[in-house]
Curated annotation (Swiss-Prot):
Pfam families: FA_synthesis (PF02504)
Catalysis performed (reactions): a fatty acyl-[ACP] + phosphate = an acyl phosphate + holo-[ACP]
Coiled-coil intervals, chain numbering: none
Keywords recorded for this protein, A-Z: Cytoplasm, Lipid biosynthesis, Lipid metabolism, Phospholipid biosynthesis, Phospholipid metabolism, Transferase
Top-level EC class as recorded in UniProt: transferase
Pathway noted in the entry: Lipid metabolism; phospholipid metabolism
Name the record gives this protein: Phosphate acyltransferase
Gene3D superfamilies: Isopropylmalate Dehydrogenase (3.40.718.10)
GO MF, one annotated term: phosphate:acyl-[acyl carrier protein] acyltransferase activity
E.C. number: 2.3.1.274
Length: 328
């Protein structure tokens, strides 16, 4: 199994990307990793090249680049070359912490979309209070969605939760403004009806306030609503940890209490760190494409590689294709 990685994408590239990739190559004996990027910048951080190769690419798609134009014009960029490795069959999956829009464009134009999937969906796995987490899609690949798209998202999320996360019968929830069957706009009402007709374990509408309670294993939404919910969760978590830090450093007594609570607080922070689940999978493409967070460190890249490896090993893409054929 070979996993291609854009070594130049992300805030901490290439150092953290290379460190995470090297750790994964050392940990998983059944994978090879291809790092794509400026070889002169990659090599200083690569201590052990066992099962790791480098493809030199002298262009980088920047965060400020217009996604589609960048993919079309920067043919020798690390991201485009990475996607080409997958398209040509030399890599089984790919990972980038770079420009999200450009990665989606490279996924669509280079890797290609699964026949029968109308639109891809960006799907991170987010933490829940019970420690199990849930798959959330779409969080921004497409701002709008038709009811049929939401039904496809549910199918892809179901396959991922079952094949990779080991959930025998994943609970599917539809993000809405209330839990009653007739809540929402025409899109969510129609999507609700379509999901009820499937063989999926559809539990109905779920509200944003219940997501971290573990109300569902897979939650589907249009990209606009999903992205707003995701950013709200991220912002709330950051604000709470910041407030907690201020409180626990406000006095000598508070600092003593913080010292006593440090192991518990560290465990809480780790539990709510969704980089432990890997990156956001771009579902609907012909191979696993993983979007790692732009601020990814070596640990996040390691888990993104683990995630890509599990998607390939469990044939998530093949299973999605088979399910589409079965239900068409």
């Amino acid at each position: 199994m070979n996993i291609a990685i854009d070594a130049m994408g992300g805030d901490h590239a290439p150092q953290e990307i290379v460190r995470g990739a090297a750790r994964a190559a050392a940990h998983f004996s059944d994978i090879r990793i291809t790092l794509i990027g400026d070889e002169a910048k990659i090599r200083p951080y690569l201590q052990n090249e066992e099962r790791i190769s480098i493809i030199h690419a002298d262009e980088v798609i920047e965060a400020t680049d217009e996604p589609v134009r960048a993919v079309r014009r920067k043919k020798n960029s690390s991201m485009v070359r990475m996607a080409e490795e997958v398209r040509e069959g030399r890599a089984d999956a790919c990972i980038s912490a770079g420009n999200t829009g450009a990665l989606m464009a490279a996924g669509l134009f280079v890797v290609g979309r699964i026949a029968g999937i109308d639109r891809p969906a960006l799907a991170p796995t987010l933490p829940t209070l019970d420690g199990k987490g849930f798959v959330f899609l779409d969080v921004g690949a497409n701002v709008d969605a038709r009811p049929e798209h939401l039904q496809q998202y549910a199918l892809m999320g179901h396959v991922y939760a079952k094949q990779v996360r080991g959930i025998a019968n994943p609970r599917i929830g539809l993000l809405n403004v209330g839990t009653e069957d007739q809540k929402g706009n025409e899109t969510t009402k129609r999507a609700f009806a379509l999901l009820k007709e499937t063989n999926l374990h559809f539990i109905g509408n779920v509200e944003a306030r219940d997501l971290l309670q573990g109300v569902a294993d897979v939650v589907v939404a249009d990209g606009f609503s999903g992205n707003v919910a995701l950013k709200t969760i991220e912002g709330t978590a950051m604000a709470l940890f910041s407030l907690l830090k201020q409180t626990l450093t406000s006095s000598v007594t508070a600092k003593l209490a913080a010292a006593a609570l440090k192991p518990k607080l560290s465990g809480l922070k780790k539990m709510m760190d969704y980089s432990e689940y890997g990156g956001a999978a771009l579902f609907g493409l012909n191979a696993p494409v993983i979007k790692a967070h732009g601020s990814s460190d070596a640990n996040a890249i390691f888990h993104a590689v683990r995630q890509a490896r599990e998607m390939v090993a469990n044939d998530v893409i093949g299973t999605i294709k088979a399910e589409l054929e079965r239900t068409s």
